[in-house]
Amino acid sequence: MVSYWDTGVLLCALLSCLLLTGSSSGSKLKDPELSLKGTQHIMQAGQTLHLQCRGEAAHKWSLPEMVSKESERLSITKSACGRNGKQFCSTLTLNTAQANHTGFYSCKYLAVPTSKKKETESAIYIFISDTGRPFVEMYSEIPEIIHMTEGRELVIPCRVTSPNITVTLKKFPLDTLIPDGKRIIWDSRKGFIISNATYKEIGLLTCEATVNGHLYKTNYLTHRQTNTIIDVQISTPRPVKLLRGHTLVLNCTATTPLNTRVQMTWSYPDEKNKRASVRRRIDQSNSHANIFYSVLTIDKMQNKDKGLYTCRVRSGPSFKSVNTSVHIYDKAFITVKHRKQQVLETVAGKRSYRLSMKVKAFPSPEVVWLKDGLPATEKSARYLTRGYSLIIKDVTEEDAGNYTILLSIKQSNVFKNLTATLIVNVKPQIYEKAVSSFPDPALYPLGSRQILTCTAYGIPQPTIKWFWHPCNHNHSEARCDFCSNNEESFILDADSNMGNRIESITQRMAIIEGKNKMASTLVVADSRISGIYICIASNKVGTVGRNISFYITDVPNGFHVNLEKMPTEGEDLKLSCTVNKFLYRDVTWILLRTVNNRTMHYSISKQKMAITKEHSITLNLTIMNVSLQDSGTYACRARNVYTGEEILQKKEITIRDQEAPYLLRNLSDHTVAISSSTTLDCHANGVPEPQITWFKNNHKIQQEPGIILGPGSSTLFIERVTEEDEGVYHCKATNQKGSVESSAYLTVQGTSDKSNLELITLTCTCVAATLFWLLLTLFIRKMKRSSSEIKTDYLSIIMDPDEVPLDEQCERLPYDASKWEFARERLKLGKSLGRGAFGKVVQASAFGIKKSPTCRTVAVKMLKEGATASEYKALMTELKILTHIGHHLNVVNLLGACTKQGGPLMVIVEYCKYGNLSNYLKSKRDLFFLNKDAALHMEPKKEKMEPGLEQGKKPRLDSVTSSESFASSGFQEDKSLSDVEEEEDSDGFYKEPITMEDLISYSFQVARGMEFLSSRKCIHRDLAARNILLSENNVVKICDFGLARDIYKNPDYVRKGDTRLPLKWMAPESIFDKIYSTKSDVWSYGVLLWEIFSLGGSPYPGVQMDEDFCSRLREGMRMRAPEYSTPEIYQIMLDCWHRDPKERPRFAELVEKLGDLLQANVQQDGKDYIPINAILTGNSGFTYSTPAFSEDFFKESISAPKFNSGSSDDVRYVNAFKFMSLERIKTFEELLPNATSMFDDYQGDSSTLLASPMLKRFTWTDSKPKASLKIDLRVTSKSKESGLSDVSRPSFCHSSCGHVSEGKRRFTYDHAELERKIACCSPPPDYNSVVLYSTPPI
């Protein structure tokens, strides 16, 4: 049933439509009018809202969401109004208005065309203010969800009930969003408007307002909804391969942003039968994305199931899919083929190279690549296996070879392999290029014959061509470079007439450093023209060139200053400076003056223009009428074109004051016999040197036959005086300051007959003397010819002195300057490492030595200033010996030498940074461990300072206070505080522990070095731990810097007559009979073993070096076993100390024995060795003497040795080898007064002044039969060696030999008793060669 109100509204609406329709084509409708004017109106809560709408047509109300039209509070009445009731009015009444009624109230016509909608609606925003409710909607407990889209507008609808309320927008947890009027806008009728929402606005947002001191909040939770699909994948490899009957499992993974839902479906070949089962799940553990899984499973796959499997993912309008193909096979198989050809090529230096094969197989086989029959990935870390490919990183020449791929399916017993050959081509390399790259080129003497070499290597073998690039003959200002002018380069051959005359160009293949290289030699027959020789090596990979600056010089060393003569006052000073024009420029003369201890450079005015010649530039300096003030140091300065360095050549000029001549002695009358000869001397001094003129009877004497004027005419010599020669002789000396003269009368006696007789006698005498001299010359030549035929392989001091004298041996040794000569300019001398009686050793930096492209630290031996010719000859002889010996790892090797004139003689050898072995072992006494396990488990502890190191010294520097050097043996070491700081980088090395394996290794290496020296027929004669240097990587090297050893200050060398000798290390035959051989070196090696296994102890501790020591040594008494020795090591020592040199082992045998011991030690790690002196009570600290080993020796309880074991528990050692029946060996320790006392190993090692020169030689008597030395394991003492250096003073012979003081020798016995008492103390006549010929050990 329709009410009247509804009927009226309906009729009004119809009428309005008619009116609006009519008015649309005619007059325009006016907007409805509201009774409240403006855009907003504020009222208080609880009041009644009256609002009337007047319009020209029927209209309706639009109200806020919280105002319900069915509410009893709301009433709307409609009526006709206006003139004649032609207008429509509607009155809205809202009783007791509430805060949530706040909003837009609008009135609009019922039927309005879309285009006129805005014009037919009127609205006003009503604020219903309530102090207890500032927000229209309150969500204080549960936040309101707001959906948002990134990039679009987001409205936070925290509307307020009064426009005057201040609202703050906050984002959990601590952010505050402040309106900026652009991106974030506050509107009291809408809330906060964010124009371009991002992910940052996702989360909990809170609007806060404070009213009357009370805080109100309303919460909103933004929710981003998206349909984005990030990625879709099938985790199974593509394509999928299966055997028939197996199960197929495909996992499809879809990744989406948060708040996204997807639909995942599958399509597959046999989908109609629905054989597949699908499981789905979602992983939301990721904070940034959702991961959806769909797993498809098909059991018992058949051939009909092969084909394409597709996974489709849809989210709203977004769609993605992924597919894979499935292959079904009946059985396993492998097929492999070459991808290209069997022989492959690549280039060295390539970042990576992929070696791959075409492989089809199922199931996936195991892949192994072999290189030359060995697993490639185990051979080098640069080989990586990727699928069926082998990746070679950073290709090198060593990567060439045969590569085999092994494919295997072991479960199906299917195997296949295929081999390919890889050739690695190498760009040519010229090995001389590194040396020729130095900025300062070489100079070649004018007219000399020169040989230029170019050695190239590459794969394939490169071809070498020579080119000539001439220098501009007018060149004077610029350097002659390949690019400095535009002159053409000419290819050379043997018949070329370009440049210098070519004698030959040859090429040959040579194996150098294990590689087959092409060596080309260009021989210049006559060096006349300066230019650049260019060596070009090329192959298919590339081309490389080497420029050889060939500068001709007519000046020695390219720079020379010449003084015509030293002028006197008033004369002219004439100097000339000549430099090579291609190497130097800006030539000028300067005068050097010293002012306030500073050298000042003063230019010299009025210098002449330089004269440019074909090869050089000459600048002359002439100072006319010099005075004494012109004395000084004149220097020619020139700038090196290549280095830019200014070079000075100095000449000291001393102007002498003029002095009138004066005679040193006047002439005196004298009488001579006829036919004899006479000489008249007239020596005069003066400045300048006076000119002498001779007169006879006032007539000037000229030189003629029979009358000879000596140098400067100061001597007049008359041959066969005749009667006519009698008269007055007058000499006159004249210079600018005056003249002086003297005269004498010469009387001639005798007759002509007598003179004829004298002439005949003189003639016969001359003939006889000539014949005698001729016969003597022939005899000497015959003797030299026979001696020169002696074989030269027995060289140096090792040659039998009875065959050829030592000096003659050394003179025969050749010195190859082309191989060993090193430019002094490339050698930078550093700190002094040590000095000796007449030589010194300095540390230096050598650039390019041994063709190395880098700077290398070396040791340089040189003479001190003022060295004599014999000392120079000694060092040169030593250099020749070094060149003869050759190279070996365990010998300090020669690197080069500087022998050319213009500088000091220098011998360059290897530098060993860790010093000598003796000092090193002493520093390790608190860090010695029997095996590596103990060393690895030791507790870290603060390193204890040695005595003497507490005052600011480092533990490393024990050689600072020692007479022994860390760089060589025996010389005094120069160390400053800065030197100490430079050695701090080695502290870590000195803190590392040392084990039994290290001691055996040192012994083994020294034996190897001595084996090498003995093979070169070299005898060391001073083999000791002080002459063993420790290099990097625990390598020891034998050395003996003989010229630098100051044996006069080293207590290891005992004076014997006028010579000091290392007696403790010398074999008996060397002491008594002066016999040196390889077997005497073996004796010294045994003493060296004793030093090593006593950790640097001094041999024969507590034993005086006197005649009693000689006698005991001759009787077979030997040293006890050292503290850290094993029975096998001690047996080796005793073998080396055999009385008969022939019974001592050869060094080759020692290498074999120690090699076996070293290998055994590595395998057993030291656990099965029993140190001989380890038979001590672990905690008592006392030393016991024990009997020799017996059968039940090892049944006794033995306490652990005093090694650092890394544990506080007692450790016992059990030997792993059998002992022979051992004879008893007498030891020196048994004779000492207090056998159990602790000896200081730093007593003077050799401290006895033995015999005077009057005692001629020792006596050696073989009164007892020879017996083989066996081990006696009787331990008589355990001396704890300690201290830093040899500090005690040398002691002297016992009273039985007579006491000898340093100042004066006094003997208390008469000669007969003396000869009987000290027959053992006579020195050999001369041991100077020990000093002269050493380093490396000879």
Curated annotation (Swiss-Prot):
InterPro entries: Ig-like_dom (IPR007110), Ig-like_dom_sf (IPR036179), Ig-like_fold (IPR013783), Ig_I-set (IPR013098), Ig_sub (IPR003599), Ig_sub2 (IPR003598), Ig_V-set (IPR013106), Immunoglobulin_dom (IPR013151). Residues 781-1338 are cytoplasmic. N-glycosylated. Its EC number is 2.7.10.1. Disulfide bonds join 53-107, 158-207, 252-311, 454-535, 577-636, 682-731. Residues 32-123, 151-214, 230-327, 335-421, 428-553, 556-654, 661-747 form the Ig-like C2-type domain. GO terms for cellular component: actin cytoskeleton; cytosol; endosome; extracellular space; focal adhesion; plasma membrane; receptor complex. Present in an inactive conformation in the absence of bound ligand. Binding of VEGFA, VEGFB or PGF leads to dimerization and activation by autophosphorylation on tyrosine residues. The keyword Protein transport does not apply. SUPFAM superfamilies: Immunoglobulin (SSF48726), Protein kinase-like (PK-like) (SSF56112). PROSITE patterns: IG_LIKE (PS50835), PROTEIN_KINASE_ATP (PS00107), PROTEIN_KINASE_DOM (PS50011), PROTEIN_KINASE_TYR (PS00109), RECEPTOR_TYR_KIN_III (PS00240). Changing residue 1061 to V: In a bladder transitional cell carcinoma sample; somatic mutation. GO terms for biological process: blood vessel morphogenesis; cell differentiation; cell migration; cell surface receptor protein tyrosine kinase signaling pathway; cellular response to vascular endothelial growth factor stimulus; embryonic morphogenesis; hyaloid vascular plexus regression; monocyte chemotaxis. Detected in normal lung, but also in placenta, liver, kidney, heart and brain tissues. Specifically expressed in most of the vascular endothelial cells, and also expressed in peripheral blood monocytes. Isoform 2 is strongly expressed in placenta. Isoform 3 is expressed in corneal epithelial cells (at protein level). Isoform 3 is expressed in vascular smooth muscle cells (VSMC). Induction: Up-regulated in coculture of VSMC/endothelial cell (EC) or by direct exposure to VEGF of VSMC monoculture. Up-regulated from the second trimester of pregnancy to the term and in the placenta of women with preeclampsia (PE). Up-regulated in monocytes exposed to bacterial lipopolysaccharide (LPS). Glycans are attached at residues 100, 164, 196, 251, 323, 402, 417, 474, 547, 597, 620, 625, 666. The keyword Nucleotide-binding applies. Residues 940-957 have a biased composition (Basic and acidic residues). Residues 827-1158 form the Protein kinase domain. Tyrosine-protein kinase that acts as a cell-surface receptor for VEGFA, VEGFB and PGF, and plays an essential role in the development of embryonic vasculature, the regulation of angiogenesis, cell survival, cell migration, macrophage function, chemotaxis, and cancer cell invasion. Acts as a positive regulator of postnatal retinal hyaloid vessel regression. May play an essential role as a negative regulator of embryonic angiogenesis by inhibiting excessive proliferation of endothelial cells. Can promote endothelial cell proliferation, survival and angiogenesis in adulthood. It is linked to Can contribute to cancer cell survival, proliferation, migration, and invasion, and tumor angiogenesis and metastasis. May contribute to cancer pathogenesis by promoting inflammatory responses and recruitment of tumor-infiltrating macrophages. Abnormally high expression of soluble isoforms (isoform 2, isoform 3 or isoform 4) may be a cause of preeclampsia. This is Vascular endothelial growth factor receptor 1. It comes from Homo sapiens. The gene is FLT1.
